[in-house]
Amino acid sequence: MTKIIFMGTPDFSTTVLEMLIAEHDVIAVVTQPDRPVGRKRVMTPPPVKKVAMKYDLPVYQPEKLSGSEELEQLLQLDVDLIVTAAFGQLLPESLLALPNLGAINVHASLLPKYRGGAPIHQAIIDGEQETGITIMYMVKKLDAGNIISQQAIKIEENDNVGTMHDKLSVLGADLLKETLPSIIEGTNESVPQDDTQATFASNIRREDERISWNKPGRQVFNQIRGLSPWPVAYTTMDDTNLKIYDAELVETNKINEPGTIIETTKKAIIVATNDNEAVAIKDMQLAGKKRMLAANYLSGAQNTLVGKKLI
């Protein structure tokens, strides 16, 4: 069986790892260190570590792989192939050169579009109607290696980061399973990326999460679904942060300053943007409160909201 080192961290990576364990010989798993999570800051292992522990696989968790003791240990292994999926660190050249079959990455975009750490988020924020999975050889430069295989998938109007993450996780494992036999046999082809067509999807920053209502409704809507259910787009109402998990676009003839609540229904808070498409907030969370449907919030506040300004 092909001896594989797997490198990944979040839930996206676990589907790929489970497939590799079932089909090949995973001799080591490399992931990020445990991190404190929640208000009580409980040290929590990354999802990939949980899967590896279930199968009693050796786990390496370097804070930074380059120059680490873990890297030296990995370089001593007899390995055929390195597979990464959302690992979160660049690999040192010494490790890239270790396996005789090379190092490959499962990336959640149709490269060369959306190189970087947040390709699913950015594709939705940009209003793309499709994205996909790329299996590629790894090189020193970020997400720039030759493409081995790709498969596209449609982004539906009601998709958000959560739904596309789940679809792409399965697609990534399936495409890798289809692609690996030719890689192992040495019969696969690969195509260089056109660097002139490259776009980038950097990790989401806090400032990317704040909604600017002075934009077309479609852009605000895409931002909300492109950040849901994590890290979540937010605005401010009455000096209190308001996270918005779900919304929809509605046509309006009412002319109001962007960010103004122009109407409430039984199920939504409707907010003006800078065009004739308003945003209807359906699922929300005020700071310090539990997440709730707008319908539940409106049962006690419906008559007090119209005219308020979100900023």
UniProtKB/Swiss-Prot annotation:
GO terms for biological process: conversion of methionyl-tRNA to N-formyl-methionyl-tRNA. GO terms for molecular function: methionyl-tRNA formyltransferase activity. InterPro entries: Fmt (IPR005794), Formyl_trans_C (IPR005793), Formyl_trans_C_sf (IPR037022), Formyl_transf_N (IPR002376), Formyl_transf_N_sf (IPR036477), Formyl_transferase-like_C_sf (IPR011034), GART_AS (IPR001555), Met-tRNA-FMT_C (IPR044135). CDD domains: FMT_core_Met-tRNA-FMT_N (cd08646), Met_tRNA_FMT_C (cd08704). Keywords: Protein biosynthesis, Transferase. One of its GO terms (cellular component) is cytosol. Belongs to the Fmt family. This is Methionyl-tRNA formyltransferase. The lineage of its organism: Bacteria, Bacillati, Bacillota, Bacilli, Bacillales.
